[in-house]
Amino acid sequence: APATYAIDPTHTFATFEIDHNGASTNRVRFKSGTVEFDRXAKAETNGGDFEARIDRNAFGV
């Protein structure tokens, strides 16, 4: 069965970057959210499932 983990804002965070035609890079850091990981599916499908849910209002630039 999948396990759900919370993003711990004091130890971890999720980020992404947007490149603007090489002129600048915007970086976004999400401060909260959850991650769901199914270890059994990883073993069965040689990759598994990974899902992240992040509140779009919970980010800092």
From Swiss-Prot:
Induction: By the herbicide dichlorprop [(R)-2-(2,4-dichlorophenoxy)propionate]. It comes from the Bacteria. Pfam families: YceI. InterPro entries: Lipid/polyisoprenoid-bd_YceI, TTHA0802/YceI-like_sf. Belongs to the UPF0312 family. On the 2D-gel the determined pI of this protein is: 6.99, its MW is: 20.9 kDa. This is UPF0312 protein.
